[in-house]
């Protein structure tokens, strides 16, 4: 993961995720956890979610959705993604425990990826359906907005420059997985 970061591959993946969220802002409650989940699966660490937090907040605000809703699901999704990542220590350890019982590594991955992703989507549905998503009806936000403590959402960073080997580093990393 360090080599991927140094080559700019992680920045490239985050940029792709940002584009997905910004192109589909109305579905932020489902896409934010999906993006952080798959970033975690690819990277093997939940730290990739940190780079998505500002984007999730901005996109949610632009759609009048409380940022706490997609953020809470996204953070949980990134941590659950660790238990489904083929490069995480958690999955490697679990495969060591289950191998004597006849559960192969690919079988374990199939079970973990499908069940954890379904759980994330069910949680996103529950949060989207049963929580108050309307940012304009939040009195605390309205107070902070009136006091000038809340910054307006910023647009996509157009100054982003991709490092020369970023795309290749992602390809090499994916082949290595």
Where does each model-flagged region fall?
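Alpha-helical transmembrane segments and, especially, the helix-loop junctions at the ends
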Residues: 36-53, 66-111, 116-128
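Juxtamembrane helix-boundary/capping and inter-helix hinge elements in multi-pass membrane proteins
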Residues: 6-9, 22-23, 59-69, 95-106, ...
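Membrane-helix interfacial "entry" motifs
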Residues: 21, 25, 100-104, 108, ...
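Primarily residues marking transmembrane-helix entry/exit sites
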Residues: 26, 68, 166-170
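Long, contiguous bundles of hydrophobic transmembrane helices that form the permeation core
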Residues: 110-177
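Membrane-embedded alpha-helical segments and adjacent helix-loop junctions characteristic
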Residues: 1-62
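Small-residue-rich segments of transmembrane alpha-helices in multi-pass membrane proteins
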Residues: 26-30, 84, 145-149
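Hydrophobic alpha-helical transmembrane segments of polytopic
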Residues: 28-32, 71, 172, 176
């Amino acid at each position: 993961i360090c080599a991927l970061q140094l080559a700019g591959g992680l920045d490239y993946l985050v940029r792709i995720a940002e584009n997905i969220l910004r192109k589909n802002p109305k579905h932020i409650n489902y896409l934010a956890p999906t993006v952080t989940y798959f970033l975690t699966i690819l990277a093997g660490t939940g730290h990739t979610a940190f780079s998505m937090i500002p984007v999730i907040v901005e996109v949610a605000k632009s759609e009048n959705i409380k940022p706490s809703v997609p953020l809470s699901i996204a953070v949980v999704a990134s941590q659950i993604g660790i238990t489904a990542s083929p490069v995480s220590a958690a999955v490697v350890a679990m495969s060591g425990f289950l191998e004597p019982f006849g559960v192969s590594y690919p079988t374990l991955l199939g079970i973990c990826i499908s069940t954890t992703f379904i759980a994330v989507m069910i949680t996103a549905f529950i949060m989207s359906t049963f929580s108050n998503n309307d940012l304009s009806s939040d009195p605390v936000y309205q107070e902070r907005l009136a006091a000038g403590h809340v910054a307006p959402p910023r647009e996509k960073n157009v100054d982003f420059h991709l490092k020369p080997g970023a795309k290749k580093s992602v390809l090499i990393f994916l082949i290595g997985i």
